[in-house]
């Protein structure tokens, strides 16, 4: 029976994602930033750095949102330190997570293929059949 091993970094990143999600939600409102949500957190093995991936509800304002979060990263880290019981809270590095945008683009492409339908042929196939 194989047991799945969990590393401390996995547990800490999950906790950071939960706590930081709440903190970022409040900070966005307080600082007038575009609305974002924390989608993932990757923490270095030494727990010194955390890559925080965020998604913006308004894609066109994503750069503004990430810049605003980078500007207040120190404040967010202080609030995170109060919420978590860690000796050392990782330094926060914010990045835009474009996986949702890429997923929507792929979904739209697949939907367009469905609209063409299985009975439709391209002009190249029509030329070959003649």
From Swiss-Prot:
Keyword annotations of the record: Cytoplasm, Ribosome biogenesis
GO cellular component labels: cytosol
Annotated region described as Disordered, given as residue ranges: 111-130
Gene3D superfamilies per record: 3.30.300.20
Compartment annotation: Cytoplasm
UniProt-listed InterPro entries: KH_dom-like_a/b (IPR015946), RbfA (IPR000238), RbfA_dom_sf (IPR023799), Ribosome-bd_factorA_CS (IPR020053)
Predominant localisation class: cytoplasm
One GO BP: maturation of SSU-rRNA
Record bears the keyword Cytoplasm: yes
Pfam families, A to Z: RBFA (PF02033)
Cytoplasm listed as a keyword: yes
Record GO terms (molecular function): ribosomal small subunit binding
Function: One of several proteins that assist in the late maturation steps of the functional core of the 30S ribosomal subunit. Associates with free 30S ribosomal subunits (but not with 30S subunits that are part of 70S ribosomes or polysomes). Required for efficient processing of 16S rRNA. May interact with the 5'-terminal helix region of 16S rRNA.
Subunit structure: Monomer. Binds 30S ribosomal subunits, but not 50S ribosomal subunits or 70S ribosomes.
NCBIfam families hit by this protein: rbfA (TIGR00082)
Family of this protein: Belongs to the RbfA family.
Protein name: Ribosome-binding factor A
Record lineage: Bacteria, Pseudomonadati, Pseudomonadota, Gammaproteobacteria, Lysobacterales
